[in-house]
Every structure is written in structure tokens, then in C-alpha cells.
Amino acid sequence: MGRVLIIGAGGVGTVVAKKVAQNSDVFTEIMLASRTKSKCDKIASEITNVKIQTAAVDADNVPELVALMKSFKPELVINVALPYQDLHIMDACLEAGVNYLDTANYEPLDEAKFEYSWQWAYKQRFEEAGLTAILGCGFDPGVTGVFTAYAAKHHFDEIHYLDIVDCNGGDHHKAFATNFNPEINIREITQKGKYYEDGQWRETEPQEIHKPLTYPNIGVRESYLLYHEELESLVKNYPTIKRARFWMTFGQEYLTHLRVMQNIGITRIDPVLYNGVEIVPIQFLKAILPNPGELGENYTGETSIGCRIRGIKDGKEKTYCVWNNCSHQAAYQETGAQGVSYTTGVPATIGALMFFKGLWRKPGVYNVEEFDPDPFMEQLMTQGLPWHEQFDLDLEL
């Protein structure tokens, strides 16, 4: 049954490999591949109950990817590499006849802009090949889309207002660090904000709109409106939505560091000449910042991510909140990774489970909310990300 190729051996790749191995009744063999094979070997050395192989692969090199896929013959690729590499991996999957799952949408290397159009354009090719591509199956995007689908299926006739709220209430005890790839993280939060309202996308300056929100078990945190990719697919798949926004918490110290780095130009994504060599400042910054995959040991506190929804059921307005809280220490004790990596890697594993069980499998390219949310929601409870819900309360939004 489940031969799976995992591409990427950072914090999320670590979690995916270990969670896949925990589900050995479904997954029978793993190939873990990354540009740096030694990182894969280290992860593989900690997995004993499932057959696991490792390989070095350049995820920008389609022929190399195809050769690996044809050699190992996986049924599914779990892509937890960089968003710049999504299209290369999808191309390789089509050539090798392999199904596909990722956790983040494509972003061009030379432009801080992400959208689904590039990947949605693959729909016909995946249909014709009889292959499934599951997009954005982390937490946000991913679980947030499943939460929305679950709310639409069970609690609303029409969803009108959707706010996705993401709080990291943890402390990694570093002056400055990002919780996932620094280059991707900084590009995401320094670009302009955007939200959907009354059929239009409205743009804001970075961190222009913010307000205090209360997060379960954490308390009040200042939350900033920014653009996040799942908004694009959710307003497409739920056309009754009148407004959709995404909020994320940042501490003042984090924002001050970020502002200084922007002001001195080290977050630039265009090449500069240094000692006769072209370097990209943000890539240099990534090299000297703490590795997100190594933050877990001293990380305390928890994350809280969820959806706050207002809409209509049986002609009456109602509100609904659904969320998960994840302890950094519990995540580290189970997988050796911090909570942000854990909350991305576990849903990717569940998405793969849904595929192998035949529950999320149909030719084409799909976002997670286009599948039945119920079996995924059940697996969240048993795989380490239990969720909670409340009805008819003040959404603060």
C-alpha cells in the first residue's frame, strides 16, 4: 500500500516523516529526500518501525526528481520543500505518474507574491493523467480550510464573514527568530496586506490594520491583518462569503527587529554585488538566523489557530469558533520539532492518510476544502491536534 516520497528535511519534513512512521498500518515505505542527504539520514536514524530510505535531490531539477520518482515508485509525493519549487515537483509528478500533496502555494523566487493561479492551471493535466494533487494541506492553509468546510457542512446554510486567527503564544528565548523558513516568513509579512470584502480584494500597508484579540488559553494578543493564501481559495469555493480576513500575532520586539532589517535593506530579495559576488540579502540573513528546526528544545508556550465565522442557519444569524491549541513542548517531546512545524506536518500526514484511504482521491488539482472534512476532523483528534468549538459568542471581529 503506502509508498510515500517526502521532499524536504527541515522542521516540517521531520514531523511528516515521524508521523507517517507512526501510521505504519497505512504507510509501508518512506523515501525522505532533500538537497542535503545528511539531514535526511539524521531523521531516518530516529525511525525504526517503517522501512525508510534517503536520497539527495535538487527540487529545482525536474529530471533529477523524475529519476528519483521512477526509481522509488511512490504513490504520493508529500512536498514540504520551498514554495518556489512547487511547480517543478508538480511537473515531475506528471512525468513520473505520481500523486501530489503540498502545504504552501507556489511563489516566484524573484517576487514576493503568492497565489494559486499557477497551480490551478495544472488541473486539466492532472485530470488527464488520472492523478490527484492536494494543495495547501498544512495548518494555515490546510486545517483552516477544513475547519471552514466543516462549518459550512454542519453549522451554516451560508457563511458571510470569515476571520482566520493565528497566534503563536510561545517563547523560543531568542532575540529574533522565525518559526519556519526565514526567507519565506519575512517575505510573507513584509508584503502588503490584503483581504476580501464585497466581491473585491482590498489592499493595506504591511501591519497597517491591527487589533487586540483574545486567544484560548493564551489571552489577549495584538493581531495584525495580513494576506494569506487560503483566503483566495475559500472565497472562490464559498461564494456566499462577504468578507474574509487573516490575522496573525507579532510581538513588538519582533516587529522592531523586522523594521530595522527592512530599513537597512537586508530583507531585499534582489541580488546585490558583494566582493565581486552576487548575493541576495534575505538569503544571507537566512544563513545567520537561528534554524527554525532547532528551536524546539527550549520553546515554551503554545500556538492557537482557528476560524471565527458568522453566517446564517435556518434563517437566523449565528456565530461559530473552531480552533486548535498546540503545546511547543509536547510537540518537541513527540517529534523533536517545535509547535509551528508540528501544526504543519501533522495535517500533511493526515492529508496523505485521506489519500491512501481513498477518501481524498480524484483526478485533478484541489484545495482541501473541496473534499469531505469529516474524516480529516476525526484524524485531527487522534493524530495530535485536537480541536474545540464554541457557538454564539462574541467573535471580537
Predicted regions and their residues:
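Helix N-cap at the beta1-alpha1 junction of Rossmann-like dinucleotide-binding domains, i.e.
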Residues: 36-38
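Hydrophobic/small residue at the entry helix of a nucleotide-binding pocket
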Residues: 12
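Rossmann-fold NAD(P)-binding glycine/threonine-rich loop
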Residues: 104-131
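C-terminal catalytic/substrate-binding lobe primarily of soluble NAD(P)-dependent oxidoreductases
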Residues: 153-397
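Conserved Rossmann-fold cofactor-binding substructure of NAD(P)-dependent oxidoreductases
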Residues: 59-73, 85
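Rossmann-fold cofactor-recognition segment
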Residues: 47-61
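N-terminal Rossmann-like NAD(P) cofactor-binding module of classical short-chain dehydrogenase/reductase
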Residues: 69, 75-79, 100-101
